[in-house]
Amino acid sequence: MRAFISLDLENIGVKKEIEKIHYELGRIKAKIKLVETSNLHFTLKFFPHIEFEDINKIIKILDNLQLEEIKIKYNDIGVFPNYNKISIIWIGIDQESANQILNIYNLINNKLKEIDIHKDQKFLPHLTIARVKKCEDNKYIQKVIEKYKNIIFG
């Protein structure tokens, strides 16, 4: 079974800003899968194959964590892996916000190590807002990215 641990985006104002970007991306002649605003999240850990028993252990750990609400400042937009072959369009966050999420990531990682459910993964805090399946000409996506390049909200 596949599973992941994430922090959900709950800020309605941020969701409205992302909807503006979604609108423009939706007008591009390309096969782009927009992430519904109700599903926007920061993935902390991804488990491509995990046993059901391990999921129960993880749930116990997560239920016992004492986390406070964090404020995130969004200040960038970009693509993975690059403009020649765009597969992900993401929203970035400022360094202070990244540090807060990284602290939560490390806390969870350390708890998972205690129960031997841990695999080191590269972690770069970002919010995936769209997946590009097929695009004949990336310049239109690039124009939308450039328009919102210096966004600051949150």
What positions do the PLM features span?
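Histidine-dependent nucleotide/RNA phosphoesterase domain, centered on the 2H-phosphoesterase fold
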Residues: 1-154
